[in-house]
Amino acid sequence: MTGTSAFKDKTLMITGGTGSFGNTVLKHFMNTDLAEIRIFSRDEKKQDDMRHRLQERSPELASKVRFFIGDVRNAQSVRDAMHGVDYIFHAAALKQVPSCEFFPMEAVRTNVIGTDNVLHAAIDEGVDRVVCLSTDKAAYPINAMGKSKAMMESIIYANARNGAGRTTICCTRYGNVMCSRGSVIPLFIDRIRKGEPLTVTDPNMTRFLMNLDEAVDLVQFAFEHANPGDLFIQKAPASTIGDLAEAVQEVFGRVGTQVIGTRHGEKLFETLMTREERLRAEDMGGYYCVACDSRDLNYDKFVVDGEVETQADESYTSHNTERLDVEGTIAKIKTAEYVQLALEGREHEAVQ
């Protein structure tokens, strides 16, 4: 991992730290000089499981990890865990589209109010840097989960515009993170093991593909390069759901597919960057950085200084990015640790 000197003798807090992202962060930070990593989450069983895994696999890292039971919905528990923290990776979220669609206020309480609690505490505690994790579903959102994440992003940008003291707050936006908790590839593999056909919502539906290591790399890149309110997006290839199902069967065995129709709140394709955001985007090689819209309540300078364009030609979507064929999709899914373990029949060892 590059740029690890910035973490020397520092304290990093990960909200939602027992999830797929938090576990991958720990793997990446195993050989850094962090003084302490704080795992903040609400599930004591997952914390206990993580504690035991760390003690077995990396006793030295385990000695640096502290666990805090709490919920981002509870502002006081967030503040109690944040004393002395230098950096925060904010990953706590409700992210399942159907459950958020049926219980939208639960998504609001975690994704919107919870983020507001984290950012207010970070500013008050003088945290140096906060990287928040968002989703492609926040761009042109049509479902409750995406709308709650779009509101989360608005809170980030508002704090950046209004002044957050010494705290730099930025955001990353992800496509589909392969083999993260609740994602489709582990479901496909499980159904193949059981001899059941793969359930496909719409074979022409497209989704961005990235692995968990790339997700952590994106956060690291944002951490190193962010100005207040910046949004970072990784350039990512995409696959159709039909080709993804075909690729998984090529690797693990054929069981056929069953088209079941789209779920509540699903899109045919996802957008990582809107037309409007592309106007402010800087191409940084493997990533885009979208600068925060710095307008305050006085828009006069935009009238006086000249005309401002309102749209780029098109959004950056899973339909117009690099499209993987079945062979390319096979190569991509094999970069996921879960798939590598599953090829040896050891997927039960994967942490999700």
Where are these regions (language model features)?
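Strand-loop microenvironment adjacent to phosphate/nucleotide-handling motifs in alpha/beta enzyme folds
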Residues: 2-6, 154, 158-352
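Conserved glycine-rich Rossmann-like NAD(P)H-binding loop of the short-chain dehydrogenase/reductase
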Residues: 33-49
